[in-house]
Amino acid sequence: MAQFLELIKNDSNIDFLGKAKLFFIISGVLIVISLFLIFTKGLNLGIDFSGGTVIQLKYEKPADLNKLRQGIGNLKIGDVSIQNFGNPEEVLIRLGKTRDIPLEELSKTIRAKLAEIDPNNKFIVERVEQVGPQVGSELQYKAMMALLYANIGVLIYVAIRFELIFAIGAILALVHDVIITLGFLSLTSKEFNLTVVAALLALIGYSLNDTIVVFDRIRERIKATANEKINIKDIMNKSINETLSRTIITSLLTFFTVLSLMIFGGEVINPFAFTLVIGIIVGTYSSIGIASGLVYLIKSLRKR
């Protein structure tokens, strides 16, 4: 069983640190492209951050989304997103910022139009929520603070458990993961909402876990070979190789689970799952090729 789970043998000798420059170039290019997309194209902010209205409906029979989109679109009340919510009878209508239309009036207008679109398919309104621009801005600020505090927490934890150099390497790798993931969100125009922020926080924890496993093995090997004249580069390479099989198997299992969620989970959960799919790929890559490379680079610079 153990051999079956050993995707890559522990005695493999891949020179990851020898390829660190290549990894840094690839990551540098991806970060530059991601930042360019984020600052030029921007993120497709959802109602949570930009403000707007959410209306959840439940029909007696499966709803015709194309008819609903065309009918509501004819009202010309701003950006509209209409999608199923869980099953074909449940519909979620998202409206962007409207032209200062009171919520009650907006709700009446939409209800009347919905009844006109498909009079033979009765519906009930399960909820109506409105997020104002001020609340949206406040949520943006809180989301950024959540990501910042998560990274500060990681810095403190890794610095205490290992040493400051490892903490710097881990933080830079996490920032790398978040920036590139945001770049893909911008590129694909996926909706950026609170569930995506939750996915980014989950990504930070997931990527850190993989990095900690590698760092822990490096620390053990440094202690075990303290009296031997072994190059730190060889120690770090050996540690990455020993944990490589575990890292890849864990990442693949998580990746396919989240990929299934993205494909079959419906439109509402798609941005969350997409963020994790990209994050797992980038996070696994950074745990193997970036985090340890950064630690080695910093250690090398300190010796000069």
Swiss-Prot record:
Q: What is its main location?
A: membrane
One function term, GO molecular function aspect: protein-transporting ATPase activity
Keyword Membrane: yes or no? yes
Membrane-spanning segments: 20-40, 143-163, 164-184, 195-215, 244-266, 276-298
Protein's membrane topology: Multi-pass membrane protein
Recorded hits in SUPFAM superfamilies, A to Z, give: Multidrug efflux transporter AcrB transmembrane domain
Q: Name one GO cellular component term.
A: plasma membrane
Localization, UniProt: Cell inner membrane
Highest taxon listed in the record's lineage: Bacteria
Tell me which UniProt keywords the record has, alphabetically.
Answer: Cell inner membrane, Cell membrane, Membrane, Protein transport, Translocation, Transmembrane, Transmembrane helix, Transport
Q: What's this protein's family per the entry?
A: Belongs to the SecD/SecF family. SecF subfamily.
Fill in the subunit field for this protein: Forms a complex with SecD. Part of the essential Sec protein translocation apparatus which comprises SecA, SecYEG and auxiliary proteins SecDF. Other proteins may also be involved.
By its UniProt entry, which PANTHER family does this protein fall under?
PROTEIN TRANSLOCASE SUBUNIT SECF, PROTEIN-EXPORT MEMBRANE PROTEIN SEC
What biological function has been recorded for the protein in this entry? Part of the Sec protein translocase complex. Interacts with the SecYEG preprotein conducting channel. SecDF uses the proton motive force (PMF) to complete protein translocation after the ATP-dependent function of SecA.
Specify the protein name: Protein translocase subunit SecF
Task: Record the organism.
Answer: Calditerrivibrio nitroreducens (strain DSM 19672 / NBRC 101217 / Yu37-1)
Q: Which gene encodes it?
A: secF
